[in-house]
Amino acid sequence: MQTDPATGPLDGLVVALDIGGTKIAGALVDDEGRIRVRSQRPTPAREDDETVMGAVGDVLAELAGSPLWEAAGAVGIGSAGPVDAYRGTVSPVNVPGWRDFPLVERVHKATGGRPVTLVGDGVAMTGAEHWLGAARGHDNALCLVVSTGVGGGLVLGGRVHPGPTGNAGHIGHMVVDMDGDPCACGGRGCVERIASGPHIARRALENGWRPGPDGDVSAAAVAAAARSGDRFRPHAAVGCSRTATPGRAES
């Protein structure tokens, strides 16, 4: 567990959970967006539902060991999707053991009955960007997150728009290549299959890219190679570009 030495009022302190296919991160966050305490575990993504929930429980238990825990009044969850915010369930494509998993109910119990809000991780990220980041001051925006999967969120009319189920803007499983590779969701040619971190690296290797002396085959290494002038052509950005209309959300 990492603790920020910052001091100050604890009004508005909340428990935040970020659940993805690679890691489960948790934090106690104050009303200025500062992370006061954080915890993280690897996601046992190929294990059964209770094993994955066990990792979530470990993160929450570590946060609960902080003296700040009692001041946290609510829980916010951004989860890989799709999610169903109305029912409080999650079915992340990259965590196959969770299908209609009652995450809100389980976290509600694990946190002593605190109220829990669930949205897709892309929607949660969009809320943060609109509050404190790149979308601040913009009435309309599409924000994208590229990690183990690909997600997104929308700002419309100055407000984050999660949609009725908490998935609005989740572009990862839009089909952009009808003849593309099969996706874990059951579709073919999805954005996530083309432009997620692991698949950016995979497609770069297939198109002739070779890693440097350190052997790093991550998407970050691919991006660094592209910036340095490497002439390989993985076309990883094509999927994302096909999901957007020409021009910017705001002129």
Which residues does each predicted region cover?
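Nucleotide/phosphate-binding catalytic cleft detector across ATP-hydrolyzing
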Residues: 1-11, 134-140, 187
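Short glycine-rich, Thr/Ser-proximal phosphate-binding strand/loop in the N-terminal lobe
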Residues: 2-54, 89-90, 166
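Short beta-strand segments
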Residues: 18, 76-80, 119, 143-149, ...
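Glycine-rich phosphate-binding loop and adjoining helix at the ATP-binding site
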Residues: 44-45, 49-57, 61, 71-75, ...
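Generic structural signal for well-ordered alpha-helical scaffold segments
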Residues: 57-65, 127-132, 238-249
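Glycine-rich phosphate-binding loop of actin/hexokinase-like ATP-binding domains
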Residues: 138-194
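A mobile "lid/hinge" subdomain adjacent to the ATP/sugar-phosphate binding pocket shared
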Residues: 188-251
